[in-house]
Amino acid sequence: MNVYEGSLVGTGLKAALVVARFNSLVTEQLLVGAADALRRHGVADGDVDVFRCPGTFELPAVLRRVVATGRYDAVVALGAVIRGGTPHFEYVSAEVTKGVAHVAMEAGCAVAMGVLTCDSMEQALERAGVKAGNKGAEAAAAAVEQANVLRAIARAPARKAE
């Protein structure tokens, strides 16, 4: 049995962070966490590009364009959808999740989801690292690991049919 896993070593990886501007109090903290995690895992600052889009709903379209350039090993979507008094939250959350998943399935690189869907601003800030933990950092670490497992798959020897 052969086991292929991705490591958390980001040396030599090129990464992109796609960040929604709406709810910037939260998304800027996600960005700080993601950038810090990439740095801690060995991705050079010069190998990280940040792309900003107006809101979380727009993330999948920008994400798709960034992935299509073929310049990145890992791409992370960062945004925040906060529940209000209308069904808008459900629509946006569902469509963004589907959109990011669709891009991830078609991508030739690692794509990670760092989009918060929260019931309140307080909850969003907690998940963005104001109290503890940062979902942006977690998504960036997942992207590094995924990029490395995709590399391992590409290098895996072909098996003979029996």
Swiss-Prot record:
Enzyme Commission number: 2.5.1.78
Domain of life per record: Bacteria
Catalytic residues identified in the record: H88 (proton donor)
Alphabetical UniProt keywords: Riboflavin biosynthesis, Transferase
UniProt keyword Methyltransferase present: no
Substrates-to-products reaction catalysed: (2S)-2-hydroxy-3-oxobutyl phosphate + 5-amino-6-(D-ribitylamino)uracil = 6,7-dimethyl-8-(1-D-ribityl)lumazine + phosphate + 2 H2O + H(+)
A single cellular component GO annotation: riboflavin synthase complex
Enzyme class: transferase
Sections of the chain in a coiled coil: none
Purpose of the protein: Catalyzes the formation of 6,7-dimethyl-8-ribityllumazine by condensation of 5-amino-6-(D-ribitylamino)uracil with 3,4-dihydroxy-2-butanone 4-phosphate. This is the penultimate step in the biosynthesis of riboflavin.
Annotated family: Belongs to the DMRL synthase family.
HAMAP family: Lumazine_synth (MF_00178)
Protein name as annotated: 6,7-dimethyl-8-ribityllumazine synthase
Gene encoding the protein: ribH
